[in-house]
Amino acid sequence: KERGDVIIATKDTHEESYLETQEGVNLPFIHCVQNTEGWQLDDAVQAAMPENATIVHKPTFGSTDLVKIIGEYVAQYGETNVHMEIVGLCTDICVVSNALIEKAFYPEMPITLDAKCCAGVTPATHDAAIATMRMCQINVINAD
């Protein structure tokens, strides 16, 4: 926020029928149902975001809308001149999905993951996701 960076937040957004989806069957934990308390951003996170931050609602692990938004910056500034830094939850589900989607669409765009600003479902799956991202040329910082 203080550096004037563009801030884009993805936000899990599910419907009441979440448990009937493939994700809901395999991850039977109702979460982020639109317009519920659990769907809202944490107050501290909201306070840290600038007023002009973009919030992308995503019903899946990775966001195709995020790809389009990043694509606008890539078109304007060039792939190597756009740098993405990723933080968030869950490292082993949504974070790794978004990182790899962006890397697939923009292989020359530098992507950094700040591991201290992420958390996985378990410490082991968090570490596995970090290892996966490193193997796919995502720059991982603060992992130790």
Language-model features, listed with the residues they occupy:
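Catalytic-core segment of enzymes that process non-peptidic bonds
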Residues: 11
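Active-site-adjacent betaalpha module
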Residues: 2-6, 15-16, 21-144
